[in-house]
């Protein structure tokens, strides 16, 4: 008898596919921040197509990593606490954004990450934030990291850096 068929219920390495979509629970504020970041991306490129939320997040994460490297090179660091501390209205004023609708409050929003690389990058960023004790480990969840990345992207880079 040939043993070419694996037993039922077993998983072969060839049948495992990377996760390409992941829903992350966020505050409703994240949806608004994504629209503001998308507007900034469209304004800074010649592409008039609206970017997807995942594209916006990937661009913002790349920008934040560049900010972090520049801050390290200047023997400084990003002031994560200052970026996350204010409420949304105060943040909008700090980042020179239009005022956000009051209805956003803390209602939930499901952000769907698309792409295995982005999913992996967001979870790796959460691990880095926890490892460096930037925030309490309980706070460093994907939804919080997404909000942080979008806020850093929308702030003036000089305001986000701290010597």
What kind of region is each of these model predictions?
Residues 2-42, 82-124:
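Short Lys/Arg-rich basic patches
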Residues 44-78, 129-163:
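Short, basic amphipathic alpha-helical segments that act as recognition/interaction helices
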């Amino acid at each position: 008898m040939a043993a070419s068929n694996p037993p039922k219920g077993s998983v072969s390495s060839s049948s495992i596919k990377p996760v390409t979509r992941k829903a992350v629970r966020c505050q409703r504020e994240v949806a608004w921040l994504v629209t503001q970041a998308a507007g900034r991306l469209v304004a800074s490129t010649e592409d008039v197509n609206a970017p997807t939320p995942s594209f916006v997040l990937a661009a913002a994460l790349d920008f934040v990593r560049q900010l972090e490297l520049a801050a390290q090179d200047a023997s400084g660091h990003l002031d994560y606490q200052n970026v996350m501390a204010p409420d949304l209205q105060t943040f909008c004023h700090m980042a020179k954004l239009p005022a956000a609708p009051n209805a956003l409050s803390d209602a939930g929003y499901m952000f769907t990450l698309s792409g295995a690389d982005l999913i992996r990058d967001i979870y790796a960023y959460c691990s880095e934030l926890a490892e460096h004790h930037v925030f309490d480990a309980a706070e460093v969840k994907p939804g919080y990291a997404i909000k942080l990345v979008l806020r850093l992207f929308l702030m003036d880079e000089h305001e986000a850096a701290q010597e």
